[in-house]
């Protein structure tokens, strides 16, 4: 792929592009990343999915929380833009875990990089999914939905399912109102914190990034609901 993007840039120097690359491959090929930057790559999409190592293991992602953070820091150091995607709602996430995901996004200064729909994405379990082999899934799924082509599932904590519904409604309305990503992030955080605190969570405050936002506008897809 390197000769391809180099040749493309040589012939069409004003042309920009984006790529999709796994976190593990970004780590393995970090020496080649400046080539993307120098040949017009606007951003790199990567399916991060979660920042919880247990969940990443269940999803067999091939990277860890630390790997993701390492890649983001390297991107920031060399001037590349990360466009991370997540499966924020899955059968193993907790209110505290969801807040942790938001905190990591804020602390890594990625609020402008994350499309707000990513805060509401729910795991889809298809007919051939390897997740069906997990004992923790068996008790949560319902009969296969032929129309949707997925196995519907419910979270063990009904509050988490309700939070997902509330957040996707919030994101949809915010998109229609053309709200800024930082504003949407703050609203999502508040909704999540309202669920966390009644469950016994204490001592959490808003991420510093909400008050001292550093990130500038990040290149992004023209279709914000693309996942």
State where each predicted segment sits.
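Glycine- and acidic
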Residues: 53-57, 83-87, 173, 204-206, ...
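Radical SAM enzyme core and accessory elements
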Residues: 130-227
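Structural recognition of alpha->loop->beta junctions
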Residues: 35-43, 102-121
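Conserved SAM/AdoMet-binding glycine-rich loop
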Residues: 1-83, 90-93
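A structural motif corresponding to the C-terminal end of an alpha-helix
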Residues: 39, 70-82, 111-113, 163, ...
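Flexible glycine/acidic-rich beta-alpha junction loops that bind and position SAM and/or redox cofactors
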Residues: 54, 58-59, 88-97, 111-153, ...
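Short, electropositive alpha-helical surface patch
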Residues: 4-10, 94-111, 139-140
């Amino acid at each position: 792929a390197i000769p391809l993007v180099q040749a493309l840039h040589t012939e069409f120097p004003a042309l920009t592009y984006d790529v999709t690359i796994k976190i593990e491959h970004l780590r393995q090929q970090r020496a080649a990343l400046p080539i993307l930057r120098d040949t017009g790559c606007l951003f790199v999409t990567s399916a991060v999915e979660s920042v919880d190592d247990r969940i990443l293991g269940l999803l067999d992602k091939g990277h860890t929380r630390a790997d993701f953070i390492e890649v983001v820091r390297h991107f920031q150091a060399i001037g590349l833009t990360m466009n991370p995607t997540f499966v924020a709602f899955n059968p193993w996430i907790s209110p505290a875990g969801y807040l942790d995901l938001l905190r990591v996004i804020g602390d890594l200064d990625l609020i402008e990089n994350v499309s707000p729909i990513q805060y509401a994405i729910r795991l889809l379990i298809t007919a051939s999914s390897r997740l069906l082999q997990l004992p923790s899934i068996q008790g949560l799924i319902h009969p296969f939905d032929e129309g949707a082509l997925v196995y519907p599932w419910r979270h063990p904590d009904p509050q988490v399912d309700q939070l997902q519904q509330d957040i996707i409604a919030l994101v949809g309305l915010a998109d229609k109102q053309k709200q800024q990503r930082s504003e949407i992030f703050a609203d999502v955080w508040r909704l999540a914190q309202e669920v966390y605190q009644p469950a016994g969570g204490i001592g959490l405050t808003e991420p510093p990034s909400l008050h001292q936002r550093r990130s500038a506008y990040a290149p992004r897809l023209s279709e914000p609901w693309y996942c």
